[in-house]
Amino acid sequence: MENTRMTIHMCYLTILLLLALLAPPCTPVSDTDDGSNSAGVDGSHRARAEATVADILSAHNEARRKVGVEPLKWSQGIARYAKDYARSRRADCAPRRSSLFYFGENIEVGKGRRWGAGALVAQWVDEGRWYDYGSSSCSAPAGSSGCGRYTQVVWRNTTQLGCGKIVCDSGDTLLVCDYFPPGNYGTGRPY
């Protein structure tokens, strides 16, 4: 009788061990994240995260190249901060600046979940059409975002960038990019 109980217990333990080994991870990868904090994610999600980072850097550095400014480098630490802040806005998806003024910051909301990060950054770069370098002024129409997001993208003293992209509860896409050192300070020109 004792031998039979021991055999049954061993069978149960073996089955539990097999189930644990075959079960999916406890924290599945969500389609609401871009993967910029990619520890422990599957290969396809990591590839999407790397493509998102490449799109963001490419869009920024192309705008910087056009005005003769050095390219930005990606910072994982800054990206973690940006991602955490973006996640804190998941419920309202509001493009409000974070309280940490140590970084420069650009925020964009795209209607719907399929916005690519490069397309969101392009909205900031597009503000450059209203920026006049000669007078260091902005002629953006009333009600627009102005030129401040563009000037942050091309600010010559900024060297590092980190961003976080999420899909909000509303289904819209929120992109937060933080910059170090911050731009848009003083009365100087961005480049």
Language model: regions and residue ranges:
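Classical eukaryotic N-terminal signal peptides for Sec-dependent ER targeting/secretion
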Residues: 1-16
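Short, well-ordered surface patches within globular domains
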Residues: 41-104
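A solvent-exposed, acidic/Ser-Thr-rich amphipathic alpha-helical stretch
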Residues: 95-121
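N-terminal signal peptide
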Residues: 17-35, 39-42
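Disulfide-stabilized extracellular recognition modules
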Residues: 29-31, 111-191
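Short clusters of hydrophobic/aromatic residues that line enzyme substrate/ligand-binding pockets
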Residues: 72, 107, 153
